[in-house]
Amino acid sequence: MKTKTDFLKMKEQGEPITMLTAYDYPSAKLAEEAEVDMILVGDSLGMVVLGYDSTVPVTVEDMIHHTKAVRRGAKETFIVTDMPFMSYHVSLQETMMNARRIVQESGAHALKVEGAGEVISTIQYLTNAGIPVVAHLGLTPQSVGVLGGYKVQGKDAESAKKLIEDAKKCEEAGAIALVLECVPMQLAELISEQLTIPTIGIGAGQKVDGQVLVYHDLISYGVNRVPKFVKQYTSVQEEIVRGISQYVTEVKTRQFPEEKHSFTMKEEDRLALYGGKQ
C-alpha cells in the first residue's frame, strides 16, 4: 500500500497520482484491481448512491458505514474519507470526536476537509493528533450555497490570489495533499508549483500532481449528466438496463427460469409426498 511518503516521492519524480471515489465493497475491489493509487470515500455518495440533491444531508454514520465496506474491498489501497457537512465546523473537541470515530471505526487512512479560513486550524489540530488530512479548495460542494452554485472558482486575479494563499496555509497546517476542484488550469499549475505536497485535480487541468474522478461518472453508472471535466471511459448503465429489461421480459413470457436454473428431486420422493397417490 502506498503511503504519504510515496505520494510525496511521486510528486518529486513527476509521476501522476490516480485517485478514484468508491463507496462500497465491489467498487473498492474493482478500483484496487485496476491499481488506483488512492481511494476517496467522498460525501458525494449522498448524491450518487443515496439519491440526495447535495452532499449536505450526509452524516458521520454514513461515512463510517461506507468506508468500512470500502476498506473490506480494498485492503491494500490508501483510503481517504470525507468529513461530512458540519462535522468539523463545531468545537475542536467535537471535531476530534467525529474524526476519531471515522478513523477508528472505519479504517480510513486519512480524512478530507473542505475550505480554508477556520478550517486551517482544524487541519493543524487533527494533524497534531496524528490524523493525516487532505485539504480541498476551489469548488467545495459542502459550501455551494455560499458559493452561488457549482461554479468555477479563482477565475479573476483577486480570488486566484486568495486560493494560492489558502493552499499555502493548508500545507503549512500539515495537510498531506490538496484537492483542487473546478479551478482554471493555469491557477492549478501555479499552486502545484508552489507546494511541496501533491495536488489532486478534478476539473483543474493537467498540470497538477494527480487526478480524481467520481466512480459513477467515470463508468456512466446511474448518472444522467456529468460535469464538463468528466471523461466517461465506459458506459455500464446501458448494459445494466439492457440486462434488467431482458430479465423482465423473460419472466413475463416464462422463458426464465429454464430447467438448467432449477433444482429437481427423484420421482419416487415426489410421489412419497402424497403417499403414492399422485
From Swiss-Prot:
Entry cofactors? Mg(2+)
Note whether Magnesium occurs among the keywords.
yes
One Pfam family, please name it: Pantoate_transf
Q: Which InterPro entries match?
A: Pantoate_hydroxy_MeTrfase, Pyrv/PenolPyrv_kinase-like_dom, Pyrv_kinase-like_dom_sf
Q: Spell out the subcellular localization from the entry.
A: Cytoplasm
Q: Which UniProt keywords apply?
A: Cytoplasm, Magnesium, Metal-binding, Pantothenate biosynthesis, Transferase
Q: Its pathway?
A: Cofactor biosynthesis; (R)-pantothenate biosynthesis; (R)-pantoate from 3-methyl-2-oxobutanoate: step 1/2
Under catalytic activity, the entry for this protein gives: 3-methyl-2-oxobutanoate + (6R)-5,10-methylene-5,6,7,8-tetrahydrofolate + H2O = 2-dehydropantoate + (6S)-5,6,7,8-tetrahydrofolate
The organism's superkingdom is given as Bacteria
Question: Sorted alphabetically, which NCBIfam families does this protein's record hold?
Answer: panB, PRK00311.1
Return the similarity comment: Belongs to the PanB family.
**Job of this protein:** Catalyzes the reversible reaction in which hydroxymethyl group from 5,10-methylenetetrahydrofolate is transferred onto alpha-ketoisovalerate to form ketopantoate.
Quaternary state and interactors: Homodecamer; pentamer of dimers.
| Name of protein | 3-methyl-2-oxobutanoate hydroxymethyltransferase
Species source reads: Bacillus cereus (strain G9842)
